[in-house]
């Protein structure tokens, strides 16, 4: 299966960092393995016309996402981060009862 097949008609495209904290030894290998899977404007153009882009943050611009993708009108990354904050506050409130 190809990236294009996986993205076609998708309503949501999401990604995460290629190298997590603590996995630095795998950095070169992972960058090489994932280099063809960067989410960028061209990739989003292959998806549904109303696609949204999400990322759980933090992100490495130029690796898993292109430099300007956060500024793309299809990006909802900052909304996602804000909503996560409110969800976490609600969980804390519930846990502290």
Regions found by a protein language model. Give the residues of each.
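Rossmann-like adenosine-cofactor binding region
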Residues: 1-68
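C-terminal helix-to-coil terminal segments
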Residues: 71-97
């Amino acid at each position: 299966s190809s990236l294009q097949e996986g993205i076609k008609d998708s309503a949501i495209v999401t990604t995460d960092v290629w190298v997590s904290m603590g996995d630095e030894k795998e950095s070169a290998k992972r960058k090489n393995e994932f280099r063809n899977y960067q989410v960028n404007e061209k990739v989003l153009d292959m998806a549904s016309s109303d696609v949204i882009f999400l990322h759980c943050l933090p992100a490495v611009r130029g690796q898993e996402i292109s430099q300007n993708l956060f500024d793309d009108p299809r990006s909802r990354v900052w909304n996602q981060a804000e909503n996560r904050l409110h969800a976490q506050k609600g969980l804390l409130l519930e846990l502290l009862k």
